[in-house]
Structures are given as structure tokens and as C-alpha cells.
Amino acid sequence: MTGASEILDVVCILLRAQERHMTTKAAFAPEEWKVVLEAPPTAGMIVITAAHGGTFRETIAMTKAYTEARAQHGESELLDEIVAAKPKVDHTLYHSPEEFRDQGLAHLRDAVALLESKATAEERDDYRRFVLTLANEVAAAHREHGQSVSPTEAEALEEITAALGAAGS
């Protein structure tokens, strides 16, 4: 009986070690890492361009979401590296808000696909929550027509949620 107990202890230790596996920047090629880094601010910019207003407050909300990410989204080395990098997105490369939205949503899907292949399930969930929290904080940062989130921002949030594969999150 002692042998089975020892084997069970070893299995538990191995499972705990596997749970603590953390993905880092080193797991990604430079172009892949750029995609993962740029997805959160892209989500924020999708919301900003959907509303056509309040850019200053919404940008401050995006910065605040980065600052608070570590405390809100658990222990994630991957998220720590993303937050520390503070990436920027050049939305001027696009000819219209619609083009930016379409390309941005594709960018979010690409980032999630990369994380699906390289990160743990917990890290993927943390990343999705971070991106959605950021997008929601940006949407709520500027009241429009008496609403904390405008209909166009709500639509953008739904599209972001779908692109992240985070239905109901």
C-alpha cells in the first residue's frame, strides 16, 4: 500500500509542476510576439474608433487597464511581459475605422490562435480576460448620450468577445 501512496504523491507533484508551467516571450518568434503584444491595445482602439469620441478619457482607461492588469488577472508571467512592454498600435495605417476594425478583429483571432498553440489554458483565459477588461474599461470611460457604453461600443465589444473566442466572458 505504501508504494501506491508514494506513486500518487509523485503524480500530484508532477501535476502541480505542470500547472505552474508558464509561457514567456521566449516561446514566440519575434513576429508572433508582436501579434500577441498588439492585440490588447488593438481591442481598445477598436472600441475608440467605434465611438468616434472621448479619445483622451478612453486612452487613459487603456493605460489604467495595463497598470491594473497584474493585480486583476492572476499570476501570469506571460501577462506580466505583455503589460511591461506597453505596445502601441498605429491606427493611421488604415483608411477607415471599418478597415481598422476588420483588420483588428483578425489580429485578435491571430493572437488567440498563437496562444492556443503555445500557452496554457489558464494563460489563454487570463489573456482573454485582460483584453476584454481593457476593452470594457475603454468603452465605459466616456459617457455618450447619457450612456456609459454607446450602442456602437457595445457592438464593438461583442465583436471583440467573438474574435477572442470568449463567449459569455
Where are these regions (language model features)?
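Small-residue-enriched hydrophobic alpha-helices in membranes
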Residues: 10-169
